[in-house]
Every structure is written in structure tokens, then in C-alpha cells.
From Swiss-Prot:
Alphabetical keyword list: Metal-binding, Ribonucleoprotein, Ribosomal protein, Zinc
A single Gene Ontology CC term: cytosol
Gene3D superfamilies: 30s Ribosomal Protein S14, Chain N
Biological classification of the source: Eukaryota, Viridiplantae, Streptophyta, Embryophyta, Tracheophyta
Protein name: Small ribosomal subunit protein uS14z/uS14y/uS14x
This protein's encoding gene: RPS29A
GO biological process, one term: translation
Family: Belongs to the universal ribosomal protein uS14 family.
One term of GO molecular function: zinc ion binding
Keyword Cell division on entry: no
InterPro entries: Ribosomal_uS14, RIbosomal_uS14_euk_arc, Ribosomal_uS14_sf
Cofactor binding, per record: Binds 1 zinc ion per subunit.
The protein's required cofactors: Zn(2+)
Entry binding sites for Zn(2+): 21, 24, 39, 42
Length: 56
């Protein structure tokens, strides 16, 4: 049983690595507010379809 078999073999149920973007699957820069669960890059590209308006 080598290192590559053991690394990330146990599922994560808590912490930042357990939550993924619902669009692309990325775990970095995640926006969880209002239950979006979307990374910031996907949020910027889909904000208008979701219903967010940029005022400035």
C-alpha cells in the first residue's frame, strides 16, 4: 500500500476540502452565502442568470 493509494482515500465530511463548486467542482474561492455553493469564477460568469445585479 503505497503513498498514492493512501492519500485522499478517506472521504472528507468537514472543512474546506469537503465543499465543492456545483458548476465546476473547484474547492477554492467558494461562495456559500445564500446557499450558492459556487466558486467566485463561476459566480462572475453566471451572476446575471442567477439574478444578481451589479449596481456600480
Amino acid at each position: 500500500m503505497g503513498h498514492s493509494n493512501v492519500w485522499n482515500s478517506h472521504p472528507k465530511k468537514y472543512g474546506p476540502g469537503s465543499r465543492l463548486c456545483r458548476v465546476c467542482g473547484n474547492s477554492h474561492g467558494l461562495i456559500r452565502k445564500y446557499g450558492l455553493n459556487c466558486c467566485r469564477q463561476c459566480f462572475r460568469s453566471n451572476a446575471k442568470e442567477i439574478g444578481f445585479i451589479k449596481y456600480r
